[in-house]
Structures are given as C-alpha cells and as structure tokens.
C-alpha cells in the first residue's frame, strides 16, 4: 500500500482527475517502497491546461509589476516556512541525502524565486530617438503560455529555475516533472496558489516524456519550451518545438565536464574539489567534472588523496542527517550506471575503488552504487566519452598545458569545466580556452541565482538564471511615433 494518497494533476488552481485512467508509481529508491500512485495525463488534459493557462495569464500579466513581485515574494516565504517538509518529501522521492535537500535544494530554489521576484519591476522598454519629430519605444511583453519539462535529479529546484523567470515576466507555465520524481513539483503548485498566483498560471501535468512531454512540445499555442534532460531527448524536443510552431526553446542538456589539476595546485584542495565534482548527490549532477586531468608526475599522489577521502563518504539511509551519500534515483538507473562501470573494467581502466553495487544491511533494498574511481583512463574509453550520471570518477594523466586543453575540449559536450591552480594568469588564460558555458577556478558546483548557467555545443541552448534569462521569457515590441508630417510616395 502506498504511503501517500493518489496524486492528481494540478490545473487551474487545484487538483483534478486526469482524463487518462492510467497511473504510475513513485518509488523510494532507498528501499523500493511505493510512495504514491500518480495519475498519467492524457492529451485532453494538455488542452485543458493550456486553456486554463491562457485565461490565468491574461489576469497575471494585467497586474502591476509590484503586485506580481509581492505575490512571488509570498511564495518565497511559504517555501522557506515549509523547507523541512519539502526536503523530507524530496529525499523520499529522489533518494538524495536529507543533508542536501534540507540545506541546499529547497533553499537555493527559493533564492532563485526571490531573485526574480525582485527583478519584476525592472522589466523595462527603451526610448530611441530617430529625429526631432520621431522616436521609437520598445515594450518587453510576456510570451504568453510557456512550458517547462524537468529532470529527475533536482525536481523542485528545476521547477523553480524555470517557473521563476517565466512568472516574473508575466507568463503562465505548464510544467511536466520527470515521471521518476514528481511529488514536490505538485507541492510547489499548491504554494503558488496559496501565495496568490492566479488560477491557471502554474499547472502541473504528470506522466511520461514520450507522451505528455511530446503533446506539450507539439501544442501550437505554447510559445516556449524550457527543457532539462539528456542530449538525445533534448534534440527531439527542440525539433518538435520548431516543427510544430517555431517555439522558442531553452535546453539544459548533458555534460562530460573536465576538471584540470595543474602542477602548482594545492593537491588537497584539488582532491576536495574532485570529490565534490563527482560524488555530491551520488554523482547525479549534470555539471559533474567526471574527467579529472592530473599531471602524470602528480597522479599517484593525487590518487592517494582521493582514496583517503572516499573512506570519509558516509553512505546509507538518506533520511539520516549523518549520511552524505544516498542511492541512485531508481533501480533502472542503477543498472545503467553499473553497465558503464563494467565497460570501464572491460576497456582497461584501472579500478582504484568501488566498481559494484553496495550490499548488506540497508543497502540490500536500495539502488546503491559504491563510489567508484577509475585511473589510467584514455580519451577513447566509453566511461570518458559518455555521460554516466552516477558516482564514477575517471582520472587521466597529462604532460603539457596545450595537451590538456586540447583533450579537455575533445568532446561533443560543453556544459562545465574547472581548473585548480595557484597561477592567476594561467587560470584566466586556460579558462578562456575551454569550450564550456559554466566554469570554475579553484572551486566547483556553485550556481548562484545571479549566475547564468547553460552549455556550449551539444550541452544546450540558451541560459537559466541571471538577468539574461528573464529577457528570454519576453518578446520585444517596437513602436514608432511620428509627430511631424508624413510623406507618401503615392
């Protein structure tokens, strides 16, 4: 029997039954428990959500900027009041350690909403003089109804990253969470309504990407799709969005990011950064620095420092505050990660630690994979080329700066990159050469609300967060005013 009641769709300010009779299960990956049955939206539900969003968006956009800002700030306050409750639910649904969800996921999501709530009154047009008798003014108008499609690794945070700028700009949003982790997004919808966001301005449709995601992407009256997920799926979403009605898109996709340790680096700091870049959130972070480049002369010393730190990982029940490493998000994903680990062994990478499923005690019922470190890796190996999205670090040796920059850029992805060095000149020189949209020097992973994030190459299109993302949820209308005579050639 499920722990929670049947989860319905959230449309037009409240829960409604789906037109589709099918449901799917939300599973706790720490122990296999069925948390809830969730209704699967039908195609008619997508249309119902669009109609509600169109109605609500007109009301929302007609409010003054200050009114919209106040309502969004109320939502921030409610999020913070319910931080622990939301974090507990997120941990059950994702398997993420409560130490992450309680102190990072909800907190940083609320920070992003607060950031955009403060920017609402700053959405302004321009006045452009042409001549004494004429000028142009511009208006930044909302797009209308937009859609967000989320990934399973940061459910409520991603929903906030997408909805905050969209709502701040006066749009309505239809959001489809990942089928794997849907629960907290439904709670976010409740919070928006409680804060005073008009009915229909934030709707949640649950179900598969293959069906519900496709119907959303193809709907002709949705003006934009913001998608977070894998590159292959992102390409399909982008193609569908374009072919259906030339929708605008934001794509935050996969990565295989390089972390370069230089020969002057503080190796203890470098090892700490590498651990965070590979094992935080059990390795399920799109920006992870999974290709760790280390000078050959320092590789053995660096490996020893990594092994020393792996021993400090506290794996176990993610509801335990002392744990910092939980299960993977699902048993299906666990099998995928184990398959990559097997390929690493087959292709000749040297296994330093891990390499298998964690077993015994609490681990037997959950989707736990041991923190895994491979070394003596080569650029052609599958574990070095493809995104694994799990706790698997690959260490690669190198000799020269030119070599490591070339190899770091030898990937179809370009989401993130980082370097560790004491040489500030080298730091800036190398960062400017790396083909990645998010870069860190002597750090890894922080993505503040003010910081635009997004990828180069096949890691994405557009940006999330920062002022520029707010503009991506508006369109510019140009208006010319003529005060003088008008001359016709006819």
Curated annotation (Swiss-Prot):
Binding site for K(+) 2: 246, 457, 460
Co-factor remark: Binds 2 potassium ions per subunit.
Site annotation Seems to be a necessary countercharge to the potassium cations: residues: 248
Leading EC class: oxidoreductase
Keyword presence, NAD: yes
GO BP, one annotated term: glycine betaine biosynthetic process from choline
Residues reported to bind K(+) 1: 27, 93, 180
Active site annotation, chain numbering: 162 (charge relay system), 252 (proton acceptor), 286 (nucleophile), 464 (charge relay system)
Cofactor field: K(+)
Highest taxon, organism lineage: Bacteria
Family: Belongs to the aldehyde dehydrogenase family.
Subunit: Dimer of dimers.
Name of the protein: Betaine aldehyde dehydrogenase
Source organism (scientific name): Pseudomonas syringae pv. syringae (strain B728a)
Gene transcribed to yield this protein: betB
């Amino acid at each position: 029997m499920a722990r929670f009641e049947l989860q319905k769709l959230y449309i037009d300010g409240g829960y409604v039954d789906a037109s589709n009779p099918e449901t799917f299960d939300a599973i706790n990956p720490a122990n296999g428990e069925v948390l809830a049955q969730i209704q699967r939206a039908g195609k008619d539900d997508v249309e119902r959500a669009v109609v509600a969003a169109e109605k609500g968006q007109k009301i929302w956009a007609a409010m003054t900027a200050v009114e919209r800002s106040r309502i969004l700030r109320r939502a921030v306050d409610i999020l913070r009041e319910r931080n622990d409750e939301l974090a507990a639910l997120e941990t059950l649904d994702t398997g993420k350690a409560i130490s992450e969800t309680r102190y990072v996921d909800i907190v940083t999501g609320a920070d992003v909403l607060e950031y955009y709530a403060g920017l609402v009154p700053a959405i302004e047009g321009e006045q452009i003089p042409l001549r004494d008798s004429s000028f142009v003014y511009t208006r930044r108008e909302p797009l209308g109804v937009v859609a967000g499609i989320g990934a399973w690794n940061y459910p409520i945070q991603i929903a906030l990253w997408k909805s905050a700028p969209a709502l701040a700009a006066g749009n309505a949003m239809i959001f489809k969470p990942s089928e794997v982790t849907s629960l907290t997004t439904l709670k976010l919808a409740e919070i928006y309504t409680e804060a005073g966001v008009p009915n229909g301005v934030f709707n949640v449709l649950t179900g598969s990407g293959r069906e519900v995601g496709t119907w959303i992407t193809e709907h002709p009256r949705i003006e934009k799709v913001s998608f977070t997920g894998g590159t292959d799926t992102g390409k399909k979403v982008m193609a569908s969005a374009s072919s259906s009605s030339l929708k605008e898109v934001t794509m935050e996709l996969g990565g295989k990011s390089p972390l370069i340790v230089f020969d002057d680096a503080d190796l203890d700091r470098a090892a700490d950064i590498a651990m965070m870049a590979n094992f935080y959130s059990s390795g399920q972070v799109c920006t992870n620095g999974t290709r760790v480049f280390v000078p050959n002369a320092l590789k053995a010393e660096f490996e020893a420092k990594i092994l020393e730190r792996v021993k400090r990982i506290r794996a176990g029940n993610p509801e335990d505050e002392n744990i910092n490493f939980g299960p993977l998000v699902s048993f299906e994903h666990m099998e995928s990660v184990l398959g990559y680990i097997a390929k690493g062994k087959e292709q000749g990478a040297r296994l330093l630690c891990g390499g298998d499923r964690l077993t015994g005690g609490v681990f037997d019922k959950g989707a736990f994979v041991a923190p895994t470190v491979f070394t003596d890796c080569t650029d052609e190996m599958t574990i070095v080329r493809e995104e694994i999205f799990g706790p698997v670090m690959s260490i690669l040796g190198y000799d020269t700066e030119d070599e490591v920059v070339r190899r770091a850029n030898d990937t179809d992805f370009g989401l993130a990159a980082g370097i560790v060095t004491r040489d500030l000149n080298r730091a800036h020189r190398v960062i400017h050469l790396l083909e990645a949209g998010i870069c860190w020097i002597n750090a890894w992973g922080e993505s503040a609300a003010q910081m635009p994030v997004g990828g180069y190459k096949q890691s994405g299109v557009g940006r999330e967060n920062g002022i520029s993302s707010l503009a991506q949820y508006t369109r510019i209308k140009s208006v010319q005013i003529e005060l003088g005579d008008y001359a016709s050639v006819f």
